[in-house]
């Protein structure tokens, strides 16, 4: 299944400047997702990272992977929005084995690929990769917690 920005914004609470997913190219709920972030010189972080040699901060690449993984949690097996999506929060609680292979710069299109390794009602584990022009630029294992907003 694919999602445009409207579908993404229905599922994620993030908004500018922290919404780091522009489009979902394919998603198999509970299994995998491929998403895109178009990296523009107009991104606010480029003002200070670095003014004369702009590079996307690695932590934001990992955040984009986490946002892609969150889309799993707010999408049911039929591709619709889960009934409890507005009642739960999704937190990044662990990052292991993060590696950054090359800089991501303005004009790059970041392809984010995430595969579910373990899903439960409260803890999820994923393997994430980010590519530019087919070349691996970053990878990490992510652990996320799902919590009720009523807790």
Curated annotation (Swiss-Prot):
Enzyme Commission number(s) from the entry: 4.2.1.59
One GO CC term on file: cytoplasm
Reaction equation(s) it catalyzes: a (3R)-hydroxyacyl-[ACP] = a (2E)-enoyl-[ACP] + H2O
Subcellular location: Cytoplasm
Active site positions: 49
Signal peptide: none
This protein's UniProt keywords: Cytoplasm, Lipid A biosynthesis, Lipid biosynthesis, Lipid metabolism, Lyase
InterPro entries in the cross-refs: FabA_FabZ, FabZ, HotDog_dom_sf
GO BP field: fatty acid biosynthetic process; lipid A biosynthetic process
CDD domains the UniProt entry points to: FabZ
MF terms in GO: (3R)-hydroxyacyl-[acyl-carrier-protein] dehydratase activity
Enzyme class, spelled out: lyase
Domain of life: Bacteria
General function of this protein: Involved in unsaturated fatty acids biosynthesis. Catalyzes the dehydration of short chain beta-hydroxyacyl-ACPs and long chain saturated and unsaturated beta-hydroxyacyl-ACPs.
Entry-linked PANTHER family: 3-HYDROXYACYL-[ACYL-CARRIER-PROTEIN] DEHYDRATASE
UniProt record similarity statement: Belongs to the thioester dehydratase family. FabZ subfamily.
Protein's UniProt name: 3-hydroxyacyl-[acyl-carrier-protein] dehydratase FabZ
Source organism of the structure: Bordetella avium (strain 197N)
């Amino acid at each position: 299944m694919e999602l445009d920005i409207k579908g993404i914004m229905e599922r994620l609470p993030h908004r500018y400047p922290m919404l780091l997913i522009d489009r979902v190219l394919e998603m198999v709920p509970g299994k995998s997702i491929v998403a895109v972030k178009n990296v523009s010189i107009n991104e606010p972080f480029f003002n200070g990272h670095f003014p004369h040699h702009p590079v996307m901060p690695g932590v934001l690449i990992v955040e984009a992977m986490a946002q892609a993984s969150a889309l799993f949690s707010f999408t049911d097996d039929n591709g619709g929005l889960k009934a409890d999506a507005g009642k739960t929060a999704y937190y990044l609680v662990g990052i292991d084995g993060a590696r950054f292979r090359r800089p991501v710069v303005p004009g790059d299109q970041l392809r984010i690929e995430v595969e579910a390794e373990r899903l439960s009602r409260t803890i999820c584990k994923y393997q994430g990769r980010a590519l530019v022009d087919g070349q691996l630029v970053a990878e990490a294992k992510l652990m996320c917690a799902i919590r009720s907003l009523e807790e």
